[in-house]
């Protein structure tokens, strides 16, 4: 659940293991 330091509005998350939640990239923690 930690923020990955990138947004994902209209673009994917680049950081491995991170996914898009509410327009920001978070990891599974």
From Swiss-Prot:
It comes from the Eukaryota. Disulfide bonds join 4-18, 8-20, 13-25. The keyword Disulfide bond applies. Transmembrane segments: none annotated. The keyword Disulfide bond applies. One of its GO terms (biological process) is defense response. This is a cyclic peptide. The presence of a 'disulfide through disulfide knot' structurally defines this protein as a knottin. Probably participates in a plant defense mechanism. Has no activity against bacteria up to a concentration of 80 uM. Has cytotoxic but no hemolytic activity. Keywords: Disulfide bond, Knottin, Plant defense. This is Chassatide C10. There is a cross-link at residues 1-29 (Cyclopeptide (Gly-Asn)). SUPFAM superfamilies: Cyclotides. Belongs to the cyclotide family. Bracelet subfamily.
């Amino acid at each position: 659940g930690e923020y990955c330091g990138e947004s994902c509005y209209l673009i994917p998350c680049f950081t491995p293991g991170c996914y898009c939640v509410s327009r920001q990239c978070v990891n599974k923690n």
